[in-house]
Amino acid sequence: MIGKLKGTIDEIGEDYVLVDVHGVCYVAHCSARTLSKLGSTGEACVLFIETYVREDQLKLFGFMTALEREWFNLLQSVQGVGAKVALAVLSTLPPGELANAIALQDRTAVSRAPGVGPKVAMRLVTELKNRAPAFAGEAINIGLKQELGEGVAAAPVADAVSALTNLGYSRDQAANAIAAAMKTAGEGADSAKLIRLGLKELAR
């Protein structure tokens, strides 16, 4: 089973990328959001892979993060959601926004994804609501680490993000604002300072 691909981009199609790994090219089907974040032909590429084996067919699905891959599998645990719909949802909502939508039972946000009607959207937010908080927290942490590196002070940052979401901002907005605030405040800043700077970022 293939878990990750590291190679160079050979071709990017409408719903897939062809990754050249030492002369062997793999087709990985991806969300539109993932494809938009990839580089150009010839550039390096790293994808987390979910391998599907169906009778005589082997299919690879590629993701920028392990979290996106986890969401891909979690979405398909809901009746009526297959790989195509799961990718459509992830094309419309990144993990942080998806977790937030489910936590808030926001069927409208989920139903924006192609192929997701009212009934499927209802099942998604209902059946996954108990799983969303954990995923949301992980999404924020991953996003902040990507912005700032691994040396992020977890507690003040998490408290600041939580405070901004309680004020009505989306998790992605809050995480991005606090990431910017951390760059201004520097390491060791407390949550109060991060909240104040984060609000300034959001007011711009």
From Swiss-Prot:
Q: Does the keyword rRNA processing apply?
A: no
Protein location: Cytoplasm
According to the record, the residues making up region (Flexible linker) are 144-151
Major subcellular location class: cytoplasm
Q: Where is this region: Domain I?
A: 1-64
Q: Which GO terms describe its biological process?
A: DNA recombination; DNA repair
Recall the GO molecular function terms of this protein's record.
ATP binding; four-way junction DNA binding; four-way junction helicase activity
Tell me the function of this protein: The RuvA-RuvB-RuvC complex processes Holliday junction (HJ) DNA during genetic recombination and DNA repair, while the RuvA-RuvB complex plays an important role in the rescue of blocked DNA replication forks via replication fork reversal (RFR). RuvA specifically binds to HJ cruciform DNA, conferring on it an open structure. The RuvB hexamer acts as an ATP-dependent pump, pulling dsDNA into and through the RuvAB complex. HJ branch migration allows RuvC to scan DNA until it finds its consensus sequence, where it cleaves and resolves the cruciform DNA.
The free-text domain note is: Has three domains with a flexible linker between the domains II and III and assumes an 'L' shape. Domain III is highly mobile and contacts RuvB.
User: Which protein, by its recorded name, is this?
Assistant: Holliday junction branch migration complex subunit RuvA
Q: What is the native source organism of this protein?
A: Rhizobium johnstonii (strain DSM 114642 / LMG 32736 / 3841)
Taxonomic lineage is: Bacteria, Pseudomonadati, Pseudomonadota, Alphaproteobacteria, Hyphomicrobiales
Q: Which gene encodes it?
A: ruvA
